[in-house]
């Protein structure tokens, strides 16, 4: 069963409540409905503070998908399976190719700048770990998170362990993420073999199908990590998944790379589409809930929230109703069969 996050009138996250309790508070006028990037929550109208318990976030990093669990001693509030950010490396390669091509035209607008080396994290690595930090900050606005526990992944080889620790993008990005998390809440880590031992002790299985949208793919490890800190359960009490995928928005691209008829490149990219911020969730009378994509000739394109498939390209901006800003797609999977949930718990 999913609990409803509760936020006080001053914006402080409180302990989540039962859906029936949330409906009662809304009916009596003590709370208002709100929606934040795929998650429903309530905001109290009169209460500005409250007593909270320890809530832990477990994170299982991955190369393609990642698991995140929000859990207290009494309940498992949320399981998130997030798609990793994987498009930045190819985007930077295309950017470098475009810059290189501009250097060899008749009018070289882009001069070589070999002495402008960029320090810090590689863009693709930073985007991966920033994505985890964005999700964590989002959860901190809705849940009273007191601690974060992460499975400590390593990129060390037998030949050059010192080189890997100091220069490997994975190791450097991981340490950057750990430093940022410690600025927010306390952090604890477990090795991969320790996570497996705890999972085997509880009798939990992990599937080999890493791309499957099931609890046993990644969230089983994030749940085990959170349960190791806060305790309370011998078996998962909530295995329902909220699948999250980041939107790939071409913010700084002004036109298509390949010229069209007559050598003219059509406009492409940007952050806004006829007054709408790209990725914003809207309601259409025919297609229902969708999000805004690109724009062309006074029309905007709408995309399906579940899988990002384009629904249409000729929607008038006046035909849609703006609902919320969003930078990712979120879909709540149905309750798994045979997990002991009652029908009234999923309404």
Name the predicted role of every residue range.
Residues 72-278, 322-347:
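Substrate-contacting helices/loops that form the catalytic groove of nucleic-acid
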